[in-house]
């Protein structure tokens, strides 16, 4: 496995790394979130994943993240070791087994330990903390529904997810802006999501299931996708009518809708208007 290579420094601070890294999983397989935290610090990373790994990391000078969940009688040991350029750093924490969302808490703690190690080693502090691939507003709305006030929620997000003060302010502002719209939703209403899983190029930070259509072989398949998408819209409209649902909003995305040609996009929007009653949509 290749050693890490620093590409860019500024004021003696590492800005960009390119390297191969192995992530080892012992006692769990929280790939998505652990990999997501790594990408906060190393956007150009290349991963190898080893599941059912040994409880101890390998000898040698490879770059790795080694994660452990060791469940004991009453407690679970959570341990993260990171090796970069031959230097390893370890953090660990134990949690009680008797937890309502045991797996979620194990995953969260492992991500916090990993974040703290990389924050110290790399010298940057991603302002959304360990939140990756999730809309913070959804968390705020969920916690409000449990009866928590905003002060309690902010303290919880700061302590448990390491979200910075400026991002907390933004998240609460967004939640407050959305709340009147959510309250105004009608009974039996639904939102239509029209998936266009194509882009003209793929962004390095993207976590969506989308494909760059940069070759003729790929673009040749788009017409067929549009044809089948229109059939799916017709079937979805039939179900909506049977269930007496009212269309509230339409979202076209996925991908990048304008990756389709103007004619292809027109075909999709025509199908939406043909099969659905859009008169009451916002």
Enumerate the predicted regions with their spans:
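Amphipathic beta-strand/beta-sheet edge segments enriched in Tyr/Trp
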Residues: 63-98
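Short Lys/Arg-enriched alpha/beta "domain-start" segment
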Residues: 20-62
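Conserved SAM/AdoMet-binding glycine-rich loop
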Residues: 231-282
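Extended acidic/polar, glycine-enriched regions
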Residues: 95-106, 110-114
């Amino acid at each position: 496995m290749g050693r890490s290579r620093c590409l860019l420094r500024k004021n003696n601070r590492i800005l960009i790394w390119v390297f191969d890294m192995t992530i080892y999983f012992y006692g769990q397989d929280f790939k998505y979130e652990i990999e997501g935290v790594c990408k906060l610090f190393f956007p150009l990373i290349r991963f190898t994943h080893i599941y059912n790994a040994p409880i101890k990391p390998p000898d040698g000078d490879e770059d790795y993240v080694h994660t452990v969940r060791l469940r004991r009688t009453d407690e679970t040991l959570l341990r993260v070791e990171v090796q970069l350029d031959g230097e390893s750093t370890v953090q660990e924490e134990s949690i009680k087994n008797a937890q309502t969302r045991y797996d979620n808490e194990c995953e969260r703690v492992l991500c916090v330990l990993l974040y703290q190690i990389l924050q110290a080693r790399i010298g940057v502090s991603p302002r959304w903390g360990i939140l990756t691939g999730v809309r913070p507003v959804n968390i705020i709305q969920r916690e409000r529904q449990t009866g928590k006030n905003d002060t309690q929620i902010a303290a919880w997000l700061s302590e448990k997810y390491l979200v910075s003060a400026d991002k907390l302010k933004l998240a609460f502002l967004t939640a407050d802006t959305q709340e009147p719209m959510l309250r105004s939703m009608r009974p039996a209403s639904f939102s239509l999501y029209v998936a266009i899983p194509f882009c003209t190029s793929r962004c390095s930070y993207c976590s969506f299931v989308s494909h760059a259509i940069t070759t003729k072989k790929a673009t040749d398949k788009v017409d067929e996708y549009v044809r089948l998408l229109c059939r799916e819209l017709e079937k979805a409209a039939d179900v909506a009518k049977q269930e007496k649902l009212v269309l509230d909003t339409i979202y076209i995305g996925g991908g990048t809708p304008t990756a389709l040609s103007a004619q292809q996009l027109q075909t999709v929007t025509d199908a939406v208007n043909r099969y659905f009653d859009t008169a009451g949509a916002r």
